[in-house]
């Protein structure tokens, strides 16, 4: 029997709601497999130290099969020491009356500090997933604050939006089909994509998506009414706000599930190299600069896939994906928002200090 490897993983916001849902997924092998043991570091602010201890007790009482070691700390130098994967959940939520520029500045400051600590203490090939909002621009701030870390090692989460899109598409298809007779489920839907910002301007697309029914590959666009696509876009764009309105808090369980899927697609062994998934990555030299006017210098959600024959963590933007002309204004809107956020980032004091 081969010896199990140990993977060092840090989570900021380690005492929070998303971390609480994510930890079991990491420690029972659902992300990196049963042959990988997790040396987990839960990092949070000093005010959350007591809650960290409570989370630690619960982890200990679960006896997870893939748990190697657990560290709880309020010191990033300790939490980030030699880590190979960093999941940045901790951020400042938007408060009533707060302008977007203020939110970007506050979070950019926090992300810059965390990124500098990762640059100083983490493994130099550390893979960084930014979840805290505004996720795309937070990821850009982190990336630029740690210039010695490869840009390709930074991503932000848009998989939650993709899963929301997959769910609503499945619901639409199920209205027309007997899903039990057809023996289908939502995981049979492939190629749905999120473009742009993780915000209400995002562009969900399904025009390259398919579903396999009874062994036959069908285009989603052939199974859904054309009139449904605009409402589907609006559903995904507004889903986060609707959830907050119903729950009184942002998503945690579904966010943790999306993080699991993101990390698995990006970093786990044995993944399908043809599978297309959405993630926010640096837009430098992207194949859509001319056709869709997506510039370099932003963190944008694209359709991505693993590099064929490459190592875990090596991904590429899928070229040739169709975005119908009628959706180009939607795409232009989300790119314009990202440009504005990047401009606000450049204008903040923390960016000037960090030479972002």
Protein language model regions, located:
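N-terminal Rossmann NAD(P)H-binding glycine-rich loop of SDR-like oxidoreductase domains
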Residues: 11-15, 23
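Conserved N-terminal Rossmann-fold NAD(P) cofactor-binding segment
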Residues: 28-83
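Rossmann-like NAD(P)(H) cofactor-binding subdomain of soluble oxidoreductases
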Residues: 99-168
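C-terminal substrate-binding/catalytic lobe of Rossmann-fold NAD(P)-dependent dehydrogenases
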Residues: 146-152, 161-356
């Amino acid at each position: 029997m081969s010896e199990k490897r140990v993977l060092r993983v840090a989570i900021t916001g380690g005492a929070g709601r998303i971390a609480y849902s994510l930890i079991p997924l990491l420690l029972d092998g659902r992300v990196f497999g049963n042959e990988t043991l997790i040396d987990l570091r839960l990092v949070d602010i000093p005010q959350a130290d007591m809650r960290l201890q409570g989370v630690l007790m619960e982890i200990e009482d679960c006896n997870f099969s893939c748990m190697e070691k657990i560290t709880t700390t309020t010191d990033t130098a300790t939490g980030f020491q030699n880590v190979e994967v960093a999941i940045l959940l901790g951020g400042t939520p938007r408060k009533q009356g707060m302008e977007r520029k203020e939110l970007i500045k506050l979070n950019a400051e926090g992300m810059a500090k965390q990124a500098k600590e990762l640059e100083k203490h983490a493994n130099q090939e550390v893979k960084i997933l930014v979840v805290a909002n505004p996720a795309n621009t937070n990821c850009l701030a982190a990336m630029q604050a740690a210039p010695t870390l490869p840009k390709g090692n930074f991503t932000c989460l848009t998989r939650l939006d993709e899963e929301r899109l997959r769910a609503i598409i499945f619901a639409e298809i199920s209205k027309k089909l007997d899903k039990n007779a057809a023996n289908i489920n939502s995981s049979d839907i492939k190629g749905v994509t999120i473009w742009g910002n993780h915000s209400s301007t995002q562009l969900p697309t399904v025009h390259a998506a398919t579903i396999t029914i009874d062994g036959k590959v069908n285009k989603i666009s052939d199974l859904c009414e054309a009139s449904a696509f605009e409402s589907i876009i609006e559903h995904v764009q507004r889903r986060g706000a609707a959830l907050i309105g119903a729950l009184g808090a942002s998503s945690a369980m579904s966010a943790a599930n999306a993080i699991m899927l993101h990390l698995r697609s990006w970093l786990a062994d044995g993944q399908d190299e043809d599978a297309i998934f959405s993630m926010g990555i640096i837009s430098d030299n992207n194949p859509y600069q001319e056709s869709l006017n997506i510039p370099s210098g932003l963190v944008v959600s694209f359709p991505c896939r693993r590099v064929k024959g490459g190592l875990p963590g090596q991904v590429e933007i899928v070229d040739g994906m169709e975005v119908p002309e009628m959706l180009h204004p939607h795409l232009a809107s989300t790119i314009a928002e990202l440009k504005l956020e990047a401009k606000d980032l450049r204008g903040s004091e923390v960016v000037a200090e960090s030479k972002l």
